[in-house]
Amino acid sequence: MKQWKYLLKKSFIKDLKELPKNIQEKIKKLVFEEIPNKNNPPEIPNVKKLKGADSYYRIRVGDYRIGFKYENGKIVFYRVLHRKQIYKRFP
């Protein structure tokens, strides 16, 4: 099992608090329980590398997307927004 270094940006925490409770729980489970058991981003369920943006990825959780950056074993979570908003505000 790989040990990730995490950083949650203030924007990520703020976005998360504004989501419906059921979506919040899914995202918390994914971020804190499932992702730490993966070795690299392609192993994370529903993840895609963003085109034209080095080291930036998104994870699909229903109609919501988690925007993060992965470099050198470190994940920085930037945003979690509805699919209509995420690409306007991330990266």
From Swiss-Prot:
Which InterPro entries does UniProt cross-reference here? RelE/ParE_toxin, RelE/ParE_toxin_dom_sf, TA_system_RelE_toxin
* Pfam family, any one: ParE_toxin
Which UniProt key words apply to this protein? Toxin-antitoxin system
Q: Which residues form the signal peptide?
A: none
Return the similarity comment.
Answer: Belongs to the RelE toxin family.
What the protein does comes down to: Toxic component of a type II toxin-antitoxin (TA) system. Its cognate antitoxin is RelB2 (Potential).
This chain's protein is named Putative toxin RelE2
Q: Which organism is it from?
A: Methanocaldococcus jannaschii (strain ATCC 43067 / DSM 2661 / JAL-1 / JCM 10045 / NBRC 100440)
Origin organism lineage: Archaea, Methanobacteriati, Methanobacteriota, Methanomada group, Methanococci
